[in-house]
């Protein structure tokens, strides 16, 4: 129970940190997708904490109730799902899954990435056409992954596939509209949505042009001639004359 409480606290802090780092601009909703990765960060924090030294926590296996998930159960009971009150992010229903993949250099094209997404899901469903129907979103810019409407049991099988980095319960990027974000994927066709794409070129502000003072460019320089009447040239020899 202590570990569960710690993970909840860490999740809350991570969500606040990730959301605050993106609140400066509402025009880039893709940045809020970082909150999706709070759960694997919790796992990394937990694993790094236990590797620093002995940490003994009295626990017992659970098959239901708060804090239980078949994802962490070696012998899962798929009929027992965690209560929705324990879900931290809106949209997490353990039916919509975010599958994040990693690609080696040289980085493949967008089309090659999407084909890889379909191939990955096909390997567990056994049918390419069925896989195309189950994929509801794809992304090749902000992150490399896709959203799939599959069971929790199948999500565990996907997690074991090569090239799969994370498999997480998906969450809304646009909570009021219940939108998971990314480019839509409908029957094998990609429907681009620029508002969910984030690139360095888009994020970088253009450098301001140098400013010039037009008044200085158009102002005529007045050259003043020396006045002959006011100041007469001085003969150096006059300073050497003896005084009378």
Swiss-Prot record:
Effect of disrupting the coding gene: Retarded growth.
The name this protein goes by in its record: Multiple organellar RNA editing factor 3, mitochondrial
This protein's UniProt keywords: Mitochondrion, mRNA processing, Transit peptide
Keyword Transit peptide among record annotations: yes
Feature: compositional bias, Polar residues: 60-80
Protein role: Involved in organellar RNA editing. Required for the processing of RNA editing sites in mitochondria.
Domain of life: Eukaryota
Assembly behavior: Heterodimer with MORF1. Homodimer and heterodimers with MORF8/RIP1, MORF4/RIP4 and MORF5/RIP5.
Organism: Arabidopsis thaliana (Mouse-ear cress)
Positions of the UniProt region annotated as Disordered: 59-82, 196-244
Family: Belongs to the MORF family.
GO-annotated cellular components: mitochondrion
A Pfam family of this chain: MORF_dom
Gene name in the database record: MORF3
Chief localisation class: mitochondrion
Keyword Repressor: no
Transit peptide: 1-62
